From Swiss-Prot:
Biological processes per GO annotation: cobalamin biosynthetic process
Pfam family of the protein (one): GATase_3
Domain GATase cobBQ-type: from-to ranges: 251-438
Protein name (Swiss-Prot/TrEMBL): Cobyric acid synthase
Family matches, as HAMAP family: CobQ (MF_00028)
Its job: Catalyzes amidations at positions B, D, E, and G on adenosylcobyrinic A,C-diamide. NH(2) groups are provided by glutamine, and one molecule of ATP is hydrogenolyzed for each amidation.
Similarity-based family: Belongs to the CobB/CobQ family. CobQ subfamily.
Amino acid sequence: MTRKIMLQGTGSDVGKSVLVAGLCRLASNRGLSVKPFKPQNMSNNAAVSDDGGEIGRAQWLQALAARVPSSVHMNPVLLKPQSDVGSQVVVQGRVAGQARGKEYQALKPGLLGSVMESFELVSAGADLVIVEGAGSPAEINLRAGDIANMGFATRAGVPVVLVGDIDRGGVIASLVGTHAILSDEDRRMVTGYLINKFRGDVTLFDDGIASIRTFTGWPCFGVVPWLKSAGRLPAEDSVVLERLARGGGKALKVAVPVLSRIANFDDLDPLAAEPDVEIVFVRPGTPLPDDAALVVIPGSKSTIADLEDFRRQGWDRDLDRHIRRGGRVIGICGGYQMLGTRVIDPLGIEGGKREIEGLGLLSVETEMAPEKTVRNSRAWSREYGVLLEGYEIHLGRTAGIDCGRAPVEIDGRRDGAMSADGRVMGTYLHGLFGSDPYRAELLRSFGIEGGGGNYRQSVDAALDEIAAELDAVLDRVWLETLLG
């Protein structure tokens, strides 16, 4: 019989995704067939699953941790926030439409069938399924029709473990408050809790555990330390960009403008892992740094709206100065579209303006189209003559003179564009920096010897380290019961 557990947070960004990934790897290391599941995710960091649809990147990573192929059924409902039209709704890997907040609330009861169907498919043949909630079950204003937290848990009969983040402060109040606000039915689903992101001597929290037990009756299943290895994993949400270290004094500075609807910014993680590379995420209201050698414009869920914001920030002028100083630019997906001379949206797919002038750094134009490209890809760098692996998730077709200097060949077809002087390039291929040979050649073009490490092996090793830490700190009785 398949064992099931669900981690729900007392709030967003408490570390549920990493804990699920770590538990998946721990179970896999014990020889179990384990699978992750998240009923509903909201993220513009999407991945292409092994069965060819869109899922949250966190669930893709959790499948990697579990050593199983990723599937659209591991994240049956994915919400991708965009501009005035609200969020794009992806159901079982395919775009099902767009919805604003109230519209989506009305849709949720109808989505529960898809969620339960996917959960049954994921559970089939597994020893253990580890489910991740979204946000907090204490948001009782959203409880009616809920499919992400207690609504799912009660329907599927999955016991819940709450996760509280002690690093942000107020963890006792958040757990006790969640207990107080839950209905009797929902409260009965909770079997205990985990304290996450603890720094220092855990015995200093013994009185805290006793207090929580007094107010709630819930046992503590473990106090998890700050997991340093998690810093080597792809980040799920753009909220982490607020606190990423900027470092200094590195050989190569790479500036990344943080777009309002930034997507798939984990493209930068392999570069950030290089010891001689400093990634500077440039927040709105801050100019692009003068001393950056490379500017990377990342993906966007709403190219036209983000291009308007780009200009409002004055980044277009900063980029022109960067080019005049001899700097280089790489645009990925939506960033590639922005680099052209024009972006048109005749069908209003993005929900805003129908046409906008591009940054004019590539002689190409993009037309948005309803057909969405979603696929994993093997590619060839025509620029450096090395193999690439990545994925495509985009709307729109791009064409123009500079496409004749396409820097990438994907499955036999040319992709992207490059300026005549070779200093500006764009591509639809996500993940190119994660290809070790490409990253090495890119760094070499800046006079840096790097890219010698295997990024994917580094991620895999980090998962093993997290699993080992969880094995050491979690309550033995609870853990052995979970893992059988």
